Amino acid sequence: MATRAEPLAAAGAVGGREGQFVLVEWSDPGGLTNRERPIAGLHVHHSDDEAWYVLEGTLGFRVGDDEVEAGPGAAVFVPRGTPHSFWNAGAGPARYVLVMPPRLKELVEALHAPGAGDFAAIFREHASELL
């Protein structure tokens, strides 16, 4: 069983030079994350928007001061500059598509790289910040 959310497939980049974004399908096995142990802790992207589309299970989100749960077929959009975190809100597995610009895909890859060290520095390198 995985100890963190795992990428399942990447659809690659879509869009033109100015509006390019990446779709990546992820899964979380359930039982490992929750509000206190999120898939991604509270952070902010200063220059990039981000969105999720839930395929299976239930994800919980903190977006700014609000919390919401999203089930299959639901989408959550987080505009740049908005603090956010997310977690598997159910007991079972969750599958979702993360929609993000290439810079955020590079951030996720850097955070999951073997031997990734200073997470705060990695976030800063990608116009983002851990809170």
Residues covered by each model-derived region:
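Double-stranded beta-helix
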Residues: 89-131
